[in-house]
Amino acid sequence: MEPQLILGSSSPRRKSILQYFRIPFTCISPSFEERSVPYQGDPVAYSQELAVGKAESIVQDHNPEGVILTADTVVIYKGKVFNKPGSHDEAIEMLKTLSGQTHSIITSVALLQQKKLMVGQETTQVTFNKLPEEYLGRYVEAFSTLDKCGGYSTQEGGGLIIHNIQGCAYNVQGLPIRTLYHLLLEFDINLWDYLV
């Protein structure tokens, strides 16, 4: 019997990564309000709380029978969280701050089915090139970065801004396959069985 997997996300990047496999899934956007959770100084705990909150909101709103998969990605630099920018100007300020620097990207993945909850996370280090400030506005406009934490995308124009990625590149896109693989095994779902 095919597993019932529910991707609790409106992210086209997460959907695209999951589509690398033949595993059937449906998408439900969580109603969880991310901005309602204050950052308390622990980026892993923060990311996990957001991922679990998304999964729990899907249970509350839809009560599906399948395995709910949610994730949350945060950018951390010098102890500060860079979520999705609220405006064009905020995205530019984020890029200025990260220019020429190394920051961390933490993605927490939560799987929830009935009362069974499994959570894991992945951390990746990303180093930016020194960015020419006069082009940052064009970058934000060209690649619609307001829906991306940190105000940037590795897939769209990433080569212009990223010097180096240490760790899982899928983590930077919002869904670390290695972490997902190990968590799905806890629900008797093996991604190796769903290779295209």
Swiss-Prot record:
Catalysis: reaction(s): dTTP + H2O = dTMP + diphosphate + H(+); UTP + H2O = UMP + diphosphate + H(+)
Q: Name one Pfam family in it.
A: Maf
Q: Name one GO biological process term.
A: nucleotide metabolic process
Specify the enzyme's EC class, one word.
hydrolase
List site positions: Important for substrate specificity. R13, T73, Q155
Which InterPro entries has this protein been placed in? ITPase-like_fam (IPR029001), Maf-like (IPR003697)
Where in or outside the cell it occurs: the entry states: Cytoplasm
Presence of keyword Iron-sulfur: no
Cellular component GO terms, alphabetically?
cytoplasm
Question: Which keywords belong to this entry?
Answer: Cytoplasm, Hydrolase, Nucleotide metabolism
What are the positions of the active site? D72 (proton acceptor)
Which Enzyme Commission number(s) are on file for it? 3.6.1.9
Specify whether tRNA-binding is a keyword of the entry: no
Query: Which cofactor(s) are needed, names only?
Result: a divalent metal cation
Q: Name one GO molecular function term.
A: UTP diphosphatase activity
Under HAMAP family, the record lists:
Maf (MF_00528)
The family note in this entry says: Belongs to the Maf family. YhdE subfamily.
Q: Tell me, what does this protein do in biology?
A: Nucleoside triphosphate pyrophosphatase that hydrolyzes dTTP and UTP. May have a dual role in cell division arrest and in preventing the incorporation of modified nucleotides into cellular nucleic acids.
Q: Which NCBIfam families match?
A: maf
Q: What is this protein called?
A: dTTP/UTP pyrophosphatase
